[in-house]
């Protein structure tokens, strides 16, 4: 095993968390400091570090609070335990873990060194990869789930159950461990230019495995899942255009179409937030560009921040696009103040395995939420 050479190690793809090990040398004025002392950084370097820290702080606050509320709501309220929402729970768990690493990364940007030791280095880098793969795998399964619900409603009665969704979520984490565990093993801390960096130590030849890793991540954590999602929604679009009533009930059809749109919006947000960093990594790896150009470095960190921002965006999308989550969020906010109506969220009647259209509602009227 040998560390990735400096020319190749400047950009590790753990949501590029360890890309900031090059941050002190990214600007010529900062790299001119022979001692590598963090105190002699340029004004532009300091300004970028402060901007990144402010952005990460906002993303961390919104992402942690929002995703914890989503998970708590799904666990607490029986009517939210639907197949679609079980997948959403998995997505929220991955997002919450990713946003929990941001305080450590903000400190790294400000201090120009990794002060937290090798154990946290392994945890942070592996969490980034887990988030990347579990998120896109979960979104892919959500799209397949919607395809089955829309195009094969009879089969959906057996396939789309909370129990099977939980089993699929476990399989997603096991599959993601095929990447996350090796990253945890390869993550190390190393001294560099008077500071400590948290980076990946690939086997020899390190440049080869570094390049292979980035290309495989681009293919299997972005291109292939997006192709599957595109096919699923293309088939759904044809079905929705050719059939006026999917379920024989206008009310159920409205719910089905509404939740299909919500999943599509969440997938679209993921693509918009993650496409820039995936493309940037491939360009950075395969094209000879000036990696010390301040504009290139600023664009890189903007792409990284955009990827993290997706983790805080999802709970906002659920709240705006899904009436059930909106009602449950309101109930959760009112509960500490004693504003919750007794029995309004938990109904004595037995829940069915299939998803329904009501959740967290004071009556048995249509809730129009995520349970279609």
Swiss-Prot record:
Cellular component terms (Gene Ontology): axon terminus; dendrite membrane; membrane; neuron projection; neuronal dense core vesicle; plasma membrane; postsynaptic density membrane; postsynaptic membrane
Entry keywords, A to Z: Cell membrane, Disulfide bond, G-protein coupled receptor, Glycoprotein, Lipoprotein, Membrane, Palmitate, Receptor, Transducer, Transmembrane, Transmembrane helix, Ubl conjugation
Disulfide bonds: 121-198
InterPro entries attached to this UniProt entry: Delta_opi_rcpt (IPR000321), GPCR_Rhodpsn (IPR000276), GPCR_Rhodpsn_7TM (IPR017452), Opioid_rcpt (IPR001418)
GO biological process: adenylate cyclase-inhibiting G protein-coupled receptor signaling pathway; adult locomotory behavior; cellular response to growth factor stimulus; cellular response to hypoxia; cellular response to toxic substance; eating behavior; G protein-coupled opioid receptor signaling pathway; G protein-coupled receptor signaling pathway
Topological category with respect to the lipid bilayer: Multi-pass membrane protein
Region (Disordered): 340-372
Localization terms from the record: Cell membrane
Cytoplasmic topological segments: 76-85, 145-163, 239-261, 322-372
Residues carrying covalently attached carbohydrate according to the record: 18, 33
Lipidation (S-palmitoyl cysteine): 333
Gene Ontology terms for molecular function: G protein-coupled enkephalin receptor activity; G protein-coupled opioid receptor activity; neuropeptide binding; receptor serine/threonine kinase binding
Record-stated family: Belongs to the G-protein coupled receptor 1 family.
Name the UniProt record assigns to this protein: Delta-type opioid receptor
Gene source species: Rattus norvegicus
Lineage, opening ranks: Eukaryota, Metazoa, Chordata, Craniata, Vertebrata
Gene this chain is encoded by: Oprd1
